[in-house]
């Protein structure tokens, strides 16, 4: 039988150096661009595109963020007036009507609504919370050229005609401890630039466009909810929400309603995001919310949520400022907003129109759930979920059938060496057989997968126990530890297995196991797609498709082998038949001899050619004293055949017939697909979750996620890693040792990745006693509190049972109300109670000095409540099913008096007298920290905390003053 020839210097051969170099280069060639895309923001253009002015946008951001401007601050009023002024400047700077005629357009009508009339009472999604809120929203309506010219909103019963419009939303309030550059200053300046863009000739929208500058998002999405009470809210059917949950970087597509409304985002020059983030919101992995839930869930619109997502350590702190973001980040969000909005307002179809709804929500229709993801930040893929479901089901059925048919064809061709221990020669009576060792390597995969994965999971538990917050600042040290441990162990286990039982079928068996594992994962993913509408498992489909093709190629490779019977016939020569129970002098088998191995084997693992000095009995099995033991019918071993020059190591002799370059194709079908689809998800999850431990989230979860993602990313190496040289694995062993020590002992926070602690000062206005407190990761929060000058000699008490442990001390008294306004603390707020004599009802009037936010907190829930002059909307129930324990009151006026009527249940099991009683606290909030000395306890914290600590607000107010009442 002719033997195929193969040059030992084959650069694509399945030998150590080609395998090591090619796999390493492919991984680096994909990982490096993924890291660059994730961390480097595309540069803003040197000159502004037509209709935009990036210099104006950056200047606007600097003006907007020159102070804290929460809803309950005087700076917020200044921002409101500045926005109105800027909007009018942009409108007045629009070209004259003659310039529009040159592009066959008419100058659009623009209407500005300064909503200082709307209000709303509603209940929170959390049980027991009610909210009354007054609007200071600003809306800019750019009439579409396809729309009627009527001013329908001036009619109390008027409704828009024609197709629905588009809403773009950003909130102009910040938190009381952050300047709001990315949350949501970049969104605000993007909306300002959209006014400029869509009033430029050539860009006039087809559909009506509403730009909403809402106020009050940070305090419970209040601004978006009260927007529903303005007539213009009836116009939009689709929306784009611009938000910030980080402090720079790229703006990612967090979530979207469906595939149809997502497609306009494909126009973005640098799209970024994955549907997995939307599934994270649905699964509750991300606890914070945006106005998206109001527009989609409460109002019935269909839209997208685009937001900054990292770093969380700067989110809601004084580092959310213009200095810590960039013009490139502004451009990234602005360019996406322009492209998406232009796609929505130019849509001529009726796909965003639906039948009228009985629940009062917008009739925007419905679209199929979507699957979407970016490719290296340059392209964006969107398709419908049912398409993925159909493809998944098809692949689940077709792939096993293809392998089954191929196996049958191999068997009929007598070339099915897989799972075959031996073969009989042609015309044999069955008493003579040749060992094929075709089962070798089948049981390796479980060890290759389980041992490295188990160790990385163990590392996750180890780091969580000894240094749970290290990933907060050193995420790539954690990744390096996990990757180096996993790859080294996978290599070590595979090399041990290959040394003990060399097999040319390591690759095909490992691919077969991978096929089975990923088939099961695809079944699970497909079930979740169909049952729960979760599309985040789309990467499993692509990974399985690549693994299937690679596995199929391995099966097709077997057609290159000789027929088993033909091979056995050649090997089982009658002249070499041994006697039944005999011994003969022999030499040790090449599989059992290690001494002198280098003499017969080149560096690349191929065996040297036989010469006249080579032992004729090489390859025989020996027992003691070089005697071969043979029992029963003689079983010829393929190792008994003289050594072939192109045989790798001590693998089966028939393997020289297998193509030596096919592994490259198999690797390129598996690893790049996994890296392309899983790599961005790994980076996305790391960025989104690595700094959530300080918020009370589970630290173990993120480490387990890193361990699992490490397995997913490097599992394509398993069919090939036994061919690796020792250089990379030993280097990774050193990396593992260093990163393990670092991750266990290094301090987890730094000035660039600060620990966020949450401040509040609570004052009993009846007694004057106050307690300042910090909440956050323990024991760091206690150490920081103990380092403050005012806590020296105090007993700091810490409540460790809370989600965020809270440490309190007697604080420096606040000065949020000037002595001229109220000489005593109890005069900071006033209330009056009028109780019904016969029923468990009462009316409470509440007002506070130098504030426009107060609340009522009851010791037991009230059945119902109403706020004087408030609007009510059936889309927003205002009483929780289990009653209301807290009523938050917000006003656009300073020192406003709220009148609240409450009714509670009489306790029939106790005395009537006690049943008619209601007790609780009246609380007012102060949130303006712009002036030094107003909240000296906060000033002290900011001045004296370590550089690795950032300060955020714990609640709506920085200072909460309360007085008790009993009715």
Swiss-Prot record:
The UniProt entry, under Gene3D superfamilies, shows:
Zn peptidases
Q: Where in the cell is it found?
A: Vacuole membrane
Which CDD domains does the annotation name? M28_Fxna_like (cd03875)
Q: What is its EC number?
A: 3.4.-.-
Top-level class of the enzyme under EC nomenclature: hydrolase
Show the active-site residues.
217 (proton acceptor)
Q: Which InterPro entries match?
A: Fxna-like_M28_dom, M28_fam, Peptidase_M28, PFF1_C, PFF1_TM
Q: Which residues cross the membrane?
A: 17-37, 388-408, 442-462, 473-493, 508-528, 533-553, 664-684, 701-721, 728-748
- Site described as Transition state stabilizer, located at 315
* Main location class: membrane
Per the record, its GO cellular-component terms are: vacuolar membrane
Cofactor section: Zn(2+)
Q: Where is this region: Disordered?
A: 579-612
Q: Which domain of life is it from?
A: Eukaryota
Which positions bind Zn(2+) 2? 183, 218, 316
Purpose: May be involved in vacuolar sorting and osmoregulation.
Q: What is this protein called?
A: Vacuolar membrane protease
């Amino acid at each position: 039988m002719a033997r195929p020839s193969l040059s030992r210097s084959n650069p694509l051969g399945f030998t150590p150096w080609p395998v090591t170099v090619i796999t390493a280069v492919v991984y680096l060639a994909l990982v490096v661009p993924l890291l660059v895309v994730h961390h480097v923001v595309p540069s803003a253009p040197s000159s502004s595109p037509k209709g935009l002015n990036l210099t104006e946008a950056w200047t606007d951001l600097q003006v907007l963020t020159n102070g804290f401007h929460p809803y309950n601050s005087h700076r917020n009023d200044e921002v409101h007036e500045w926005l109105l002024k800027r909007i009018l400047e942009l409108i007045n700077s629009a070209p004259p009507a003659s310039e529009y005629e040159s592009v066959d357009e008419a100058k659009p009508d623009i209407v500005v609504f300064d909503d200082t009339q709307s209000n709303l009472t509603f209940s929170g999604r959390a049980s027991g919370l009610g909210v009354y809120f007054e609007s200071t929203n600003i809306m800019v309506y750019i009439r579409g050229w396809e729309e009627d010219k009527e001013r329908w909103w001036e009619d109390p019963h008027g409704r828009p005609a024609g197709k629905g419009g588009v809403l773009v939303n950003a909130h102009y309030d910040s938190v009381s401890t952050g300047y709001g550059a990315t949350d949501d200053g970049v969104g605000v300046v993007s909306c300002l630039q959209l006014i400029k863009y869509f009033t430029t000739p050539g860009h006039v929208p087809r559909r009506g466009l509403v730009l909403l500058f809402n106020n009050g998002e940070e305090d419970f999405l209040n601004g978006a909810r009260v927007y529903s009470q303005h007539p213009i809210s009836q116009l939009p059917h689709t929306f784009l929400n611009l938000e910030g949950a980080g402090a720079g970087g790229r703006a990612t597509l967090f979530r979207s309603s469906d595939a149809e409304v997502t497609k306009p985002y494909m126009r973005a020059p640098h799209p970024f995001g994955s549907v997995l983030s939307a599934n994270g919101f649905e699964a509750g992995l991300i606890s914070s919310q945006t106005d998206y839930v109001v527009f989609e869930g409460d109002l019935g619109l269909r839209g997208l949520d685009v937001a900054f997502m990292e770093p969380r350590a700067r989110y809601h702190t004084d580092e959310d400022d213009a200095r810590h973001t960039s013009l490139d980040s502004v451009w990234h969000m602005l360019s996406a907003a322009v492209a998406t909005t232009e796609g929505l307002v130019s849509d001529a179809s009726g796909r965003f129109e639906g039948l009228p709804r009985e629940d009062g929500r917008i009739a925007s229709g419905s679209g199929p759930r979507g699957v979407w993801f970016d490719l290296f930040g340059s392209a964006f893929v969107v398709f419908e979920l049912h398409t993925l479901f159909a493809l998944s089901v098809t692949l689940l059925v077709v792939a096993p059938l293809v392998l089954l048919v191929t196996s049958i064809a191999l068997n009929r061709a007598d070339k099915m060496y897989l799972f075959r221990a031996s073969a009989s020669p042609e015309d044999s009576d069955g008493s003579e057989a040749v060992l094929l060792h075709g089962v070798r390597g089948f049981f390796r995969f479980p060890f290759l997968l389980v041992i490295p994965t188990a160790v990385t999971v163990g590392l996750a538990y180890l780091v969580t126990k000894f240094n749970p917050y290290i990933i907060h600042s050193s995420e790539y040290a954690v990744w390096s530890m996990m990757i180096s441990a996993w790859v080294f162990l996978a290599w070590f286990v595979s090399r041990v297995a290959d040394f003990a039982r060399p097999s040319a079928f390591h690759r095909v068996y490992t691919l077969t196991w991978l096929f089975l594992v990923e088939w099961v994962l695809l079944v699970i993913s497909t079930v979740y797609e169909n049952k729960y509408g979760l599309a985040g498992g789309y990467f499993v489909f692509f990974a399985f498709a690549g693994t299937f093709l690679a596995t199929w190629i391995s099966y097709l490779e077997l057609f290159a082998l000789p027929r088993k019977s033909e091979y056995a016939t050649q090997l089982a020569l009658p002249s070499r038949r041994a006697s039944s129970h005999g011994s003969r002098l022999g030499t040790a088998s090449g599989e059992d001899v290690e001494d002198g191995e280098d003499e017969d084997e080149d560096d690349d693992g191929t065996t040297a050619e036989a010469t006249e000095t080579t032992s004729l009995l090489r390859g025989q099995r020996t027992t003691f004293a070089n005697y071969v033991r043979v029992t029963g019918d003689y079983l010829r071993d393929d190792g008994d055949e003289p050594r072939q020059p192109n045989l790798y190591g001590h693998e089966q002799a028939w393997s020289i017939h297998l193509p030596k370059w096919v592994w490259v194709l198999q690797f390129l079908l598996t690893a790049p697909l996994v890296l392309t689809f899983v790599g961005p998800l790994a980076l996305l999850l790391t960025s989104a979750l690595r700094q959530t431990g300080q918020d009370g989230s589970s630290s173990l979860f993120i480490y387990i996620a890193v361990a699992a993602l490490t397995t997913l990313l490097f599992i394509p190496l398993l069919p090939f890693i036994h061919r690796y040289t020792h250089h990379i694995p030993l280097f990774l062993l050193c990396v593992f040792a260093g990163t393990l020590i670092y991750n266990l002992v290094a301090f987890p926070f730094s000035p660039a990745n600060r620990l966020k602690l949450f401040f509040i000062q609570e004052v009993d206005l009846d007694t004057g006693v106050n307690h300042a407190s910090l909440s956050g990761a323990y024991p760091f929060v206690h150490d920081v509190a103990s380092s403050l000058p005012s806590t020296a000699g105090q007993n700091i008490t810490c409540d460790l049972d809370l989600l965020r442990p809270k440490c309190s001390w007697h604080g420096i008294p606040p000065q949020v109300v000037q002595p001229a306004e109220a000489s005593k603390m109890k005069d900071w707020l006033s209330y009056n109670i009028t109780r019904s004599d016969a029923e468990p009802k009462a009316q409470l009037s509440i007002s506070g000095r130098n504030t426009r936010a107060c609340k009522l907190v009851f010791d037991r829930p009230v059945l119902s409540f109403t706020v004087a002059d408030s609007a009510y909307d059936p889309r927003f129930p205002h009483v929780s099913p289990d009653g209301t324990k807290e009523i938050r009151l917000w006003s656009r006026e300073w020192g406003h008096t709220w009148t609240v009527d409450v009714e509670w249940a009489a306790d029939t099991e106790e005395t009537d007298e006690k049943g008619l009683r209601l007790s609780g606290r009246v609380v007012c909030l102060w949130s303006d920290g712009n002036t030094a000395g107003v909240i000296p306890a906060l000033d002290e914290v900011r001045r004296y905390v370590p550089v690795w600590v950032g300060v955020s607000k714990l609640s709506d107010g920085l200072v909460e003053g309360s007085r008790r009442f009993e009715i």
